[in-house]
Each structure stands twice: as C-alpha cells, then as structure tokens.
C-alpha cells in the first residue's frame, strides 16, 4: 500500500541500489550494503542498477540449434556466419535464412580466427572432424594442408603472423609458415612439457606491455589445467623461440574458454574466470585471483551441474561494457550468463537468453539459439516476451547491531521512460520471502510482494523517477528489500532505497 511519508514516524535511512553486484561468496550477515543476494537480469552500473535490454530475432528458419557464430572482419565488408546442423549459413542480414554456403558437415561446433595476409583478409574455421575452410570475403575454399590430417584441426589462433592449430585428442600443436593460410603444417608435441598429461584445448596470445614485441606471448592450454607459455617468432629456430614457463590453473571448460580483454585474456575454468595478468604474474591461481571470486558459490554450482554440457563460452562485449560467461543447460529456459561490469568488476546474472554460441558483429552482440540467431542487448522485450528482473539486497542492520527495529515503510527510488509497475518485497533476519507476485491486500509486505503503479516526477526527460512509500509491519535486527519487475516496453533503473524504522527497547 503506497502512502504519504508525512504520516510516518521514526528514523529514515537511504542506501544505494546494489551497484556492488551479486555476492554469493560471503556470509549474508557480512554483505556490504551495496551488494546483492540475488541480481537477475539487472546490470550493475556505477551509479545504479538497470534492467538489461532485451533481444530480437535476427535470422530465423535455421534447421537446428545454432552451435557456432563466426564473424569475418575486413576493411571493406564484415560478414557473420552460423553453423547449424550439418551446414553453415550467411546470417549477416536480418530475416529468413538463405541457402547453406557449406554443407555435409560432421558437426557444427567450430572455432575460428581472422587473419590478414598479402593475399587478403580471411576467416579461418575448423571443427576437429571436417576439413578446415576459409572465407575471403566473397567465397569459401578448403585450404591444402600438408603433413597433417587436416580434419584433426580443432582450434586455431594467430601469433606472430602465423596460424597455430590445436590437434584433436593430443598435446600436439601445428603451425604454418609466416603469412600463410595453407601449406605444410609443422607439428610440435608438448608431451614432455606438461606433467599432467591430457590434451590441448585452446591457444591464445597474451601481451605484457599491450603491444606486439618481445613481451608478446603464446599460451597453450590443456584440459588438465596446465598452461605452457612461449615467446618468440619461429618455433623451428631455438634461438628465436623459447619456453617462458609452465603454470597450473583450473581446468578450462570447453574449447571457447578464452576471451581477450585489451592486452589481457581471461580463461573460463572450473575454478572461475581467471585473468592471465594475475595468474601468470603470480605463477599460481589462488582462489582470490579469480575475477569471479565474489560469485564463487553460484559459479561452482554451475560448474558441478553443467560443465559437461556444450555451450560454455566467454565473450567480451565492449559496447555494453561487460564480459559474459555463458552457462548452457540441457533444459530450455535454464541457460544463464554470468555478467561482469568491466569498469567496476561487479557481477550479475542474466537469464532467459538460451544461447549456445555468442559473437560480437559490427559492435553488436548476437547469440545462436534453437533455429534462430538473436540480436542481444536490443529493445525492451525478449523476442516479444517480458523481461523478468529480480533482485534482493543485502541484509542491512539499520541503526546498528545493538537491537531490533520496527520497520514501518520502504521507498525504492526507480526511474523509467514510461509508467512503471514494480513489485516490492521485504524480509527481516535473513528470511527468504516468497518470489511470486502476490499483491498485498492488507498493506503489509513483510513476507510477500506489494504491487503498485507509482506516481512520477520528471527526471532527465523522457526519463522519470518513481517514488512511493510502501507500508510494512515487521520487527527484526536487519532487513533486506526485494524488487521484481516484468517489462516489455520500458527501460528501468533502480537508483536507491529509503527505509523508515523505529528503534526501541524490548521490541
């Protein structure tokens, strides 16, 4: 029940929205007031949290699940391709899918890289079962690759003007001559370098100084959590190639376990999201080195349940200011993305985006679902459906820890670009109230939701603030606020919350 603050008594305390992000690591008794116990489909910006944008259908009518999105970047034209079923399709333009551009494939789980040589710009793709292909901006071709079974190439990276390859089910990597997209592949077995055995999963580059030069390194990752770092320009010349070190970290999850952020690269592992600047700088992967340390409990739960499911991927989205770890599920609707604000390091969780593959194309974010490619971070609904955003703040000891309080009213301060309907919940003493929409009929929302359409005040037109007091009737040492909104037509921000309470003896 919304009511005028003039009729209320007692103290009032304001605290910010949970801009510190999701925290599933620490005891609920010790969470900072800026952290959240739950933060689904809210993005923690520096000054507020906001409901994420929606997604739109981009290309429809693909034959099966889209398991790969591959982007060709050149100086003249960019193109995006999707692998679905046994074929690859051009999905650059929105609309119904056209005819396949590659057919008769064994699987649709590709890794890819862009490389520019004197012969042009190329997208080079491989899947570990079929012969690799490359696209030059106008046509696909199959490169001639000598001294290796080409179909065994399952991952690819560019380093020092060469293509480097991971070969399936082995600790062997291959590489081509400088500025080449085809030719004789030289092979190197790293079995004597790694002490835990296993197989190579991925290759990435890591630059200490942010540029190409003596500090530009190549990293080889095994499925057992070992990293071999090399530096140099020519693996066939011992005077121009050398092992820098071997490091032990968490086991990587999937082939798409690397994402590059500036000169750094992040590794998606069973132990969390690890930045190479920290891991390779310290030579170890202590728990607090993980960027995901603050969400370690929920992250670990996801690893235990889904680590064997295809679709784990790290993706960096500069336009949105965040990176995401995609966690797939065998059940539709249960996919999640752990989201980290690249500026503040705050985390949240996105849901209802069932993406098996992710890519940034022309600065926009896309994901591949079941028979469709979607454009993410677009619009205010999820392909016509509502965006369900739910948050729960930390439990805060208003007025200190010296005694219980009687809580009488709360006022979340929200902002949106149209009339806003939001549901509010209120919990005390670490209780976990209902998470269903249950409009109050008594004016009390101690363990339920109260739904109201708020009065508005101009706030940076066309954005308006929504401020209404909600009556509560509860006693406790601490309290947490829950917010839930279901929206299809508006942008929503949560700015702060006011809580009114009375401190008394013997309450």
Where are the regions a protein language model picked out?
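Surface-exposed extracellular loop regions of Gram-negative outer-membrane beta-barrel proteins
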Residues: 219-247
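Solenoidal tandem-repeat scaffolds enriched in leucines and small polar residues
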Residues: 156-213
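Hydrophobic core segments of beta-strands in well-ordered, beta-rich domains
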Residues: 81-83, 124-125, 161-166, 214-223, ...
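A short beta-strand motif characteristic of beta-propeller blades
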Residues: 54-60, 98-103, 141-146, 188-194, ...
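Beta-sheet repeat architectures centered on beta-propellers
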Residues: 1-98, 104-123, 248-264, 270-507
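Short loop/turn segments that connect beta-strands within beta-propeller blades
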Residues: 92-95, 136-139, 179, 233-235, ...
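Asp-box/WD-like beta-propeller blade repeats and closely related beta-sheet repeat scaffolds
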Residues: 137-160
């Amino acid at each position: 029940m919304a009511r005028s603050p003039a009729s209320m008594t007692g103290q009032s305390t304001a605290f910010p929205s949970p801009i510190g992000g999701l925290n599933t690591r620490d005891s609920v008794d010790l969470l900072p007031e800026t952290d959240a116990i739950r933060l689904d489909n809210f993005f923690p910006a520096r000054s507020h949290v906001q409901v994420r944008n929606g997604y739109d259908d981009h290309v429809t009518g693909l034959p099966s699940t889209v398991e790969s999105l591959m982007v060709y970047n050149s100086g003249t034209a960019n193109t995006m391709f999707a692998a679905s079923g046994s074929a690859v399709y051009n999905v650059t333009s929105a609309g119904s899918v056209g005819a396949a551009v590659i057919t008769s494939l064994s699987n649709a789980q590709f890794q890819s890289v862009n490389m520019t040589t004197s012969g042009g710009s190329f997208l080079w793709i491989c899947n570990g079962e079929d012969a690799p292909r490359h696209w030059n901006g106008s046509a696909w071709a199959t490169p001639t690759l000598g001294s290796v079974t080409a179909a065994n190439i399952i991952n690819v990276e560019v380093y020092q003007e060469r293509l480097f390859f991971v070969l399936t089910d082995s600790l062997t990597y291959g590489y081509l001559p400088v500025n080449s997209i085809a030719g004789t592949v030289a092979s190197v077995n790293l079995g004597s370098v790694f002490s835990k055995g296993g197989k190579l999963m991925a290759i990435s580059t890591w630059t200490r100084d942010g540029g190409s030069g003596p500090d530009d390194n190549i990293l080889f990752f095994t499925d057992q959590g070992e990293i071999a770092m090399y530096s140099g320009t020519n693996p066939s010349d011992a005077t121009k190639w050398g092992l820098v070190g071997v490091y032990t970290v968490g086991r990587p999850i999937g082939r798409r376990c690397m994402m590059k952020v500036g000169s750094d690269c992040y590794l998606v592992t069973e132990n969390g999201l690890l930045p190479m600047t920290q891991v390779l700088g310290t030579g170890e992967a202590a728990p607090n080195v993980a960027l995901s340390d603050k969400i370690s409990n929920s992250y670990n739960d996801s690893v235990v349940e889904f680590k064997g499911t295809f679709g784990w991927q790290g993706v960096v989205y500069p336009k949105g200011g965040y990176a995401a770890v995609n966690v797939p599920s065998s059940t539709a609707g249960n996919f999640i993305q752990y989201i980290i604000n690249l500026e503040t390091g705050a985390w949240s969780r996105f849901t209802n985006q069932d993406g098996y593959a992710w890519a940034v194309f022309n600065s926009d974010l896309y994901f591949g679902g079941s028979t469709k490619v979607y454009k993410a971070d677009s619009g205010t609904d999820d392909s016509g459906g509502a965006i369900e955003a739910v948050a729960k703040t930390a439990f805060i000891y208003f007025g200190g820890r010296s005694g219980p309080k009687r809580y009488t009213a709360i006022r979340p301060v929200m902002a949106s670009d149209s009339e806003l309907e939001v549901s509010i919940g209120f919990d005390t003493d670490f209780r976990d109230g209902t998470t269903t929409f249950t409009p109050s009929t008594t004016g009390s929302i101690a363990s339920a939701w109260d739904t109201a359409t708020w009065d508005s005040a101009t706030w940076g037109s066309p954005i308006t603030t929504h401020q209404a007091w909600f009556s509560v009737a509860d006693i406790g040492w601490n309290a947490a606020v829950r917010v839930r909104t279901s929206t299809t037509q508006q942008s929503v921000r949560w700015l702060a919350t006011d809580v009114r309470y009375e401190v008394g003896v013997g309450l």
